[in-house]
Amino acid sequence: MAELTLQERLQPSLLDRLTDDEPGNLKEAAERRVLTLNQLKASVLRDLAWLFNTTSLFDHGPAARMPAGNSVLNYGLPALAGHTASSVDVHAIEALLTETIATFEPRIIRSSLRVRAQLLPGEMDHNALSFEIEGDLWAEPAPLRLLLTTNLDLETGHVRVAQGERRRT
């Protein structure tokens, strides 16, 4: 198989490319300008954790439907702390997570994105919800499958994102 050109290799996110970890070094090494598949997955996992743990400027009312609602001004999720699992609409949170990922994480192919609540009675806490996020990451030569588990603590609003594992039924 022919080696991929520099344009075809996986590049770090724009934020990672703009961040200078070595300001004294005027030239960046070639291996810092491209990512491996594992580095890409780790980068997306980190960025989703940042996204979910940031409170958006607008709630999902009329202001969120204005052009600024889909801009970086509204990066993050609405405040979710202070609820109990029985008082929230789980399907609405699934839709909220799906739309937030589709808007702010372009490396996940939108048509492949699926967010599902994990409503397993023995594993649920009354103040926490768990979601499975599944999708394909854009990559060359072929998309890369991504499976994540997301735990939302409704008391604090903190979200933990981890690499998921397919459950056997």
From Swiss-Prot:
Origin species: Pseudomonas aeruginosa (strain ATCC 15692 / DSM 22644 / CIP 104116 / JCM 14847 / LMG 12228 / 1C / PRS 101 / PAO1)
Task: Give the InterPro entries listed for this entry.
Answer: IraD/Gp25-like, T6SS_TssE1-like, TssE1-like
Would the keyword Cytoplasm turn up in this protein's UniProt record?
yes
Q: Quaternary structure?
A: Interacts with TssB1 (via N-terminus). Interacts with TssA1.
Q: List UniProt keywords, sorted A-Z.
A: Cytoplasm
Its function? Core component of the H1 type VI (H1-T6SS) secretion system that plays a role in the release of toxins targeting both eukaryotic and prokaryotic species. Plays a role in correct elongation and stability of TssB1-sheath. Functions downstream of TssK1 and prevents detachment of TssB1-sheath and its premature disassembly. Once bound onto the sheath via an interaction with TssB1, provides an ideal docking point for ClpV1 to be recruited to the sheath.
NCBIfam families registered for this protein in UniProt: VI_zyme
Name recorded for this polypeptide: Type VI secretion system component TssE1
Q: Where does it sit, as one GO cellular component term?
A: cytoplasm
Q: Pfam families, from UniProt? A: GPW_gp25
Which superkingdom, per the lineage?
A: Bacteria
Q: What is the effect of changing residue 105 to A?
A: More than 90% loss of VgrG1a and VgrG1c secretion
Compartments (UniProt record): Cytoplasm
Show the coiled coil region(s). none
Query: What results from gene inactivation?
Result: Deletion mutant does not prevent TssB1 assembly into a sheath-like structure. However, the sheath exhibits an aberrant phenotype and break itself in smaller pieces.
